[in-house]
């Protein structure tokens, strides 16, 4: 799937994931620093938290990172796809299909009602086909963006991430194959627990095409839509 997507001129593959929550404060992070830093002996209540959410383009070595100060919800994740697409859509005007590599996390798995509803809305709004290609349990390490997170972790190990600005600054100065990421701060507050009724999800489900025998792991949201879609 990934290979065929990368070979097609009108298909763009992205790898997306959220990194572990970063606690902001004078906390020890391990590693070594060229300058002397002092960390607390114990991890007390953090001043804030930031969750890096990344979108990586494997064939172009481009990385976009969004520092989320709220909970990372289904709405948050789809909003990041929208935010990213708005910045690149003119450059990728020839793209008709977006393939998204993801792990099967709680906020973005293919049975998560709000996540799937928002993606259907994205397809309709931007007139682009979306295909979700999930990694099965214990295989998320093969998602390409995980390599980027490893580079970032090594980059800021030994540093004090004692402010949100410090987290963003270290993220901006990391490099992937010599290229710095595009980094944005997102302070929107997201509500948790948003979900559709069974009837509403049934309508969404009618707009999805699931691969037989791999229904949870590969989902196609076509455009133009099937004639059964509501107008």
Model-derived regions, located:
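Charge-mixed, compositionally biased segments that are often intrinsically disordered regulatory tracts
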Residues: 1-38
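A general structural motif
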Residues: 11, 93-97, 129
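Extended hydrophobic secondary-structure segments that form protein cores and membrane-embedded regions
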Residues: 14-15, 97-104, 132-137, 170-171
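Electropositive, glycine- and tryptophan-enriched low-complexity nucleic-acid-binding patches
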Residues: 38-101, 106
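C-terminal accessory extensions appended to soluble enzyme cores
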Residues: 90, 158-231
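Acidic, metal-coordinating catalytic cores used for nucleic-acid/nucleotide bond scission
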Residues: 102-115, 136-142
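Two-metal-ion acidic nuclease core segments, chiefly of the RNase H-like superfamily
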Residues: 115-133
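RNase H-like two-metal-ion nuclease catalytic core shared by retroviral integrases
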Residues: 132-154
């Amino acid at each position: 799937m990934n290979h065929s997507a990368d070979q097609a001129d009108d298909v763009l593959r992205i790898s997306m994931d959220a990194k572990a929550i970063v606690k902001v404060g004078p906390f020890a992070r391990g590693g070594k620093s060229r300058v002397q830093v002092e960390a607390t002996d114990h991890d007390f209540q953090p001043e804030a938290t930031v969750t890096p959410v990344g979108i990586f383009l494997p064939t172009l070595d481009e990385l976009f990172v969004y520092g989320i100060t709220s909970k990372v919800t289904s709405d948050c994740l789809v909003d990041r796809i929208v935010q990213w697409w708005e910045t690149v859509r003119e450059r990728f005007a020839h793209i008709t299909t977006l393939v998204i590599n993801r792990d099967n996390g709680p906020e973005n798995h293919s049975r998560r009602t709000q996540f799937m509803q928002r993606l259907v809305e994205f397809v309709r709004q931007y007139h682009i086909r979306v295909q979700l290609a999930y990694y099965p349990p214990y295989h998320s390490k093969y998602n390409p963006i995980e390599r980027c997170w490893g580079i970032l972790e090594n980059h800021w190990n030994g540093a004090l991430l004692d402010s949100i600005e410090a987290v963003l600054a270290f993220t901006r100065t990391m490099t992937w194959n010599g290229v710095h990421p595009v980094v944005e701060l997102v302070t929107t507050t997201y509500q948790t627990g948003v979900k559709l009724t069974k009837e509403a999800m049934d309508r969404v489900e009618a707009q999805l095409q699931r691969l037989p025998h791999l229904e949870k792991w590969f989902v196609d949201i076509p455009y133009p839509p099937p004639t059964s879609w509501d107008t």
